[in-house]
Every structure is written in C-alpha cells, then in structure tokens.
Amino acid sequence: MQGRLSSWLVKHGLIHRSLGFDYQGIETLQIKPEDWHSIAVILYVYGYNYLRSQCAYDVAPGGLLASVYHLTRLEYGIDQPEEVCIKIFVARKNPRIPSIFWVWKSADFQEKESYDMLGISYDNHPRLRRILMPESWIGWPLRKDYIAPNFYEIQDAH
C-alpha cells in the first residue's frame, strides 16, 4: 500500500521504495543516496519545511549503515501536520550521502553526530567534523563491529 507522498513521487517519476507505515501511520520511504539531494529539494518545495530529526544506525555487523530523516509539513491552521520518514542505506566501506544542510539548516549538528559516531560522510556539508569524540579518535563507536580501545585512565588516590 502506497501513501500519499509515495503516490505523488511515482506520478512524477521519482525513484524510491515504499517501506510501509510505522505504528503512528507515518509513511517510510527508501531513497538511493545518489537521488537524495534532488528529492530532498523537491520535498522541501512540496512543503516539507521542517526537519524534525536526523539520525543514523548500523543495520547489522558488516552490513549497511542507515541515515534516517523525519520530515514534517508545517502549515498554518493545520492541527495534524503531514510527516514522512526517509531512510538512506549505504555500504559501510565508503559511506557517503549528500548533505541536506543547504536545504534544512537544522541538519548541521545531526549530520555531524552521525559522522562522529558511525563514520557516514555527508558530502558538501560545510563543517563536517567530530563533535562528541576527540579529533584524534580512531574508529566509529556506534558501529556494531567497533572494537573499543583497551586503555585505562589513571586517577589520583587523593
């Protein structure tokens, strides 16, 4: 079953895959990384003017990484705004996704956090860098195949 947005994307020849609906009835769509930036601009023009959240996760050890976007269509006088969830899957060997910072500025720190924790590189992000881990940190702590470094902090006994 396709939702309203999925039907609209099909009507306009925009390639995607419907992943169904969540428990709240919010449609989830899968977009290819190479199509993401152009579809993001189209969604913004279509009325999805608010990036509610962006997060990322490791699908399986040695498997794909996912970047997830929750978009909302805010309009004056509407009690129940329309929402959509977008998922983009990338290979962990070279995880690159176009940044949507230039579409929704609120993606700034969210994309930085996904980079810092999972190593997903957001192309054309103006200041992509680590924000939680030290710049010298090696590896991506939230990947399921991450091996924690074996170090101990020595503290004073006083």
Swiss-Prot record:
Quaternary state and interactors: NDH is composed of at least 16 different subunits, 5 of which are encoded in the nucleus.
Record-listed E.C. numbers: 7.1.1.-
MF terms in GO: NADH dehydrogenase (ubiquinone) activity; quinone binding
GO cellular component: chloroplast thylakoid membrane
Location, primary (coarse class): plastid
Keywords: Chloroplast, Membrane, NAD, NADP, Plastid, Plastoquinone, Quinone, Thylakoid, Translocase, Transport
Annotated Pfam families: Complex1_30kDa (PF00329)
SS bond list: none
Catalytic activities: a plastoquinone + NADH + (n+1) H(+)(in) = a plastoquinol + NAD(+) + n H(+)(out); a plastoquinone + NADPH + (n+1) H(+)(in) = a plastoquinol + NADP(+) + n H(+)(out)
InterPro entries in the cross-refs: NADH_DH_suC (IPR010218), NADH_quin_OxRdtase_su_C/D-like (IPR037232), NADH_UbQ_OxRdtase_30kDa_su (IPR001268)
Lineage: Eukaryota, Viridiplantae, Streptophyta, Embryophyta, Tracheophyta
Organism field: Glycine max (Soybean)
Membrane topology: Peripheral membrane protein
Family classification: Belongs to the complex I 30 kDa subunit family.
Protein's recorded name: NAD(P)H-quinone oxidoreductase subunit J, chloroplastic
GO BP annotations, alphabetical order: photosynthesis, light reaction
Keyword Plastid: yes
Keyword field contains Repressor: no
Function (record text): NDH shuttles electrons from NAD(P)H:plastoquinone, via FMN and iron-sulfur (Fe-S) centers, to quinones in the photosynthetic chain and possibly in a chloroplast respiratory chain. The immediate electron acceptor for the enzyme in this species is believed to be plastoquinone. Couples the redox reaction to proton translocation, and thus conserves the redox energy in a proton gradient.
Localization per Swiss-Prot or TrEMBL: Plastid, Chloroplast thylakoid membrane
Gene that specifies this protein: ndhJ
SUPFAM superfamilies: Nqo5-like
